[in-house]
Amino acid sequence: MQYSIEINKNTEIFDIDKVAKQAAGAVLMRQGKSVVLATVAREEKQVEEDFLPLTVQYIEKAYAAGKIPGGYVKRETKPSDAETLTARIIDRSLRPLFPKGYAYPTQIVVMVLSADPKVDLQVMSLNAASVALYLSDIPMKAPVCGVRIGKIDGNFILNPNNEELQNSTLDLYVAGVKDELLMIEMRALPDQKENEIFIEAPYADVLTQTTSQNMNELSEDEILEALNLAQKAILNGSNAYEEAFSKHKKNSQIELKNEIEHPEILAFIENNFQKQIKEAINQMAKSERASELNKIAKEILNLEITKDWSEESVLNTLAKVKRKLIREQILNEGKRADGRSLNEVRPISIETNILPNAHGSCLFTRGQTQALVVATLGGENDSQMIDLLTEKNPISERFMVNYNFPGFSVGEASPIKAPGRRELGHGNLAKRALYPSVDENYPYVIRLVSEILESNGSSSMATVCGGSLALKAAGVPSLKLVAGVAMGLIFEDNKYAVLTDIMGLEDHDGDMDFKVAGSKDGVTALQMDIKLGGIDQEILKQALYQAKEGRIHILNIMEEAAKEIIVNEEVLPKLELFSVDPSKIVDIIGQAGKTIKEIVEKFGVSIDLDREKGEVKIAGSQNEQIKAAKDYIINITSSQKGTKKGPKDKDISGFELGQEFQGIVKKIAPFGAFVELKNGVDGLLHSSKIKHLNLSENQSLKVKISEIKNGKISVDLCE
């Protein structure tokens, strides 16, 4: 059965009961030339543990874009970072709608079968997964709808296509159900005025060469305006899906777990251990560990009166009492577990360039959360190549942020593994926050690595703060400092409190995790996840403005720290950019890349070439190496055979092997000396031939021609 729905600028075609009929729910969705299959499957047996056993997989099939997978194995293997991040978005959007007590292992799989470069696959995939979930026998109150908002020429655009998004200064992705928002991801997209930039200097001068670039931060009011547009579109989409598919939804006969109450345990703990629990909460405010509660549980279980109670029932009841006390204290007294007021930021300390051989580093500590962020600068060859499904060729990523979360940061003895979804998500958020502050014409590739050394909430925002200062410490000409703060929410019985700079305890027992990053002039990135099943704009407004207050407080501290930064120029890479005739680029490369490989190995530099513009970029650790490589390249391109001669090219037709000349040393380079023979024509006397001599410029020297090749002359000393 097929349904065609015109909604939010898109025509969406759904086929139900056509494919994957043994799944609990399945749809084949078409939009433009894109085709997505979304399926939902669940196990019959519930898990014993108290959590939602949901997994989401998003898979892009190479054949969807007419490609064969690259690499040695010609099939899809582990998911790419882009696939993992999309799966995470779908998970975060749908997870809040699962009913309390649902404990069946459930898997949502979204497969891209055909990819249209103009279609937003993230929005399409979420909506397909939402409809498949709604059609299943899993109880859902209504379908989720996802939309994207862009901003072009100052106007907000609903669901921009991929081409329009290239010209947008905003990328806002919102998911919700009816009039409630469930998940938000936003980033500002910088734009740049077309100014020609040319760098012919070592590192120190590169810093002064910038173009006019706007970070395009959004004000709090602009964000609320965009969210209002998104909310209306989500309501339209959610209603349209419900109207079309409600009659096809499977009857639910799923049994939900009833929360087991232990009134006698609850009364006993509240009457006898409330003081100890409050003390435990104060201890837990300094760590993400629950060891203090475990100690109380052991003490209770050792009593004679409690010998028939299970450890699980005592621990669960303790957790409820703890949660209740934390929330009541915040709502009724305006006081948090660590004694802070609702809008107070934890104490901050900052140290920069503490790693003497790293290009730039910052140790950022906020309360019991500590991030060591290290910046490394590299050449074009260090960029990350990413193969996107809808791009014909791999794209080059020149700004990277890697986030690492070892177990010791929360006191756990766990092995360090490859980055998971959480690490990729936090790194991506920090990258989105910092990217607008970096000049797009900055000639170096940048890699930021955040090592979380201690964690008690807001580690991704500590990464943003430390990352912004690490860039400064590496001499990167960032446009503005960027800081981030995590906001929380406690909502109960129509009373609510918004919390600034939440710690792990408040994240765990709170109702919202709302991360906001930006400069003093506005927001560059935000991310919201809600546990309530929806949030209204009035609470969002308070959270945004309270976040601004906290962000500016943090930025003031960061600005003072930035004034004390001493850039360690000795360890920074050096770079020179110059131009040659574009037709000579092939001479620099040589046959099968032989010449450029020789230059790289000989001088210990990296070289990037722009064939169209004739630009040559040389990067290395020593100015002398770079200058020598540049001279070598200029010598190669100055009189190459087969190219048109310019006014500076010399005629070497009268020179022969074995000819002797009384030449003059015109220039000395690390790889040899250039000796003028006659009529302004030079020959290269290689350094290996003059180790025993102490040459100087303008010195007279008797030489003979040993080689004439590709328009170049090499000479030896006469015996």
Curated annotation (Swiss-Prot):
Cofactor: Mg(2+)
SMART domains: KH, S1
InterPro entries: ExoRNase_PH_dom1, ExoRNase_PH_dom2, ExoRNase_PH_dom2_sf, KH_dom, KH_dom_type_1, KH_dom_type_1_sf, NA-bd_OB-fold, PNPase
Disulfide bridges in this chain: none
Residues binding Mg(2+), per UniProt: D507, D513
PROSITE patterns, sorted: KH_TYPE_1, S1
Known function: Involved in mRNA degradation. Catalyzes the phosphorolysis of single-stranded polyribonucleotides processively in the 3'- to 5'-direction.
Protein name: Polyribonucleotide nucleotidyltransferase
UniProt lineage: Bacteria, Pseudomonadati, Campylobacterota, Epsilonproteobacteria, Campylobacterales
Designated gene of the protein: pnp
